[in-house]
Amino acid sequence: FTGWSAKNGHWQFPSENDGTFVYRQSWHDAGPKFLLGMLIYPEQPAMKDGRDVLDRLASHPRVAKFICKKLIRRFISDTPKQALIDSAATIFRANWQAPDQIERVMRHILNSDDFINSFGQKNRRPFDAAVAAMRALGGDWTLRPDHSRSNDFMWLYGFTGHAPYNWPAPNGYPDTGLAWSGSNSFAMTWRVLGWLTETRDGEVPLHPIVDTTRANVPVANWTANNLVTWWCTRLLGYQPQAARKQALVAFMAQNGDPNTYVIADTNTWQGSDLKRHYNHERLRSLVALILMTPEFMSR
């Protein structure tokens, strides 16, 4: 791959500095090479050495198993079964020149019994959790440079240890639950999830939790049990285990009856009667708590 480069302001070509790919024939080692049992002949046409290497790797059986194992680990389980690795690798190799090669491999993996039975076996990494929360909360804001809330988010998110493109080794961030199950990883991810539910951009909430609740649960039905049930369905797709749901209901109800007391659509201080105390703030905190449950943090 000598000669494969980028236009990066090199001293020989200072005017070329836009980051695009460039092949420089004069930099290329045109001598013979030997790779994985294959002889690469000398003085080949431009870029053919590199393309021959890529073709050799793309068709190699160990490469097929390596990539398929990573895909299965990503989508199914931290400990992929060898039978599925082998069957996926067979499809990978049989279609190594097909334009839809990865699509065929993924269709095989996602239609497998291993995938069908994999619910809850994977943990969401911090990035997955943050993006899933934004999607589920109906956010409509875009991270962008020179924007205070975007900068706040990226600063806070950086403490999770999962900042995009920040892993120094070429193997990418770990994709196993153990790597992201430490107290720091969870705590920093929870901070991000809490921030997403509470933060405003000026006077506009980043995520319209109160408005979403109004649009989907009639205010006359705002009992603690109804609110928890609706938001669990929205964020999880199902109801969490009974003890966990009861804790969420108790938090939302405070000193009110969870089944009969209708929580007012207000946000005022009522310190002597907690069932009426900062109801909107409590609703947003309820949503944050659901996002922090094991049910949301798994997939």
Annotated model-derived regions:
Residues 1-81:
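Non-catalytic, conformational "gating/processing" segments within enzyme and secreted inhibitor domains
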Residues 60-64, 68-96, 107-299:
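Flexible, low-complexity segments enriched for small/polar residues
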Residues 9, 100-102, 116-119:
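Acidic/polar loop patches that form or flank catalytic/metal-binding clefts of enzymes
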Residues 4, 45-48, 100, 222, ...:
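Short coil/turn linker and secondary-structure boundary residues
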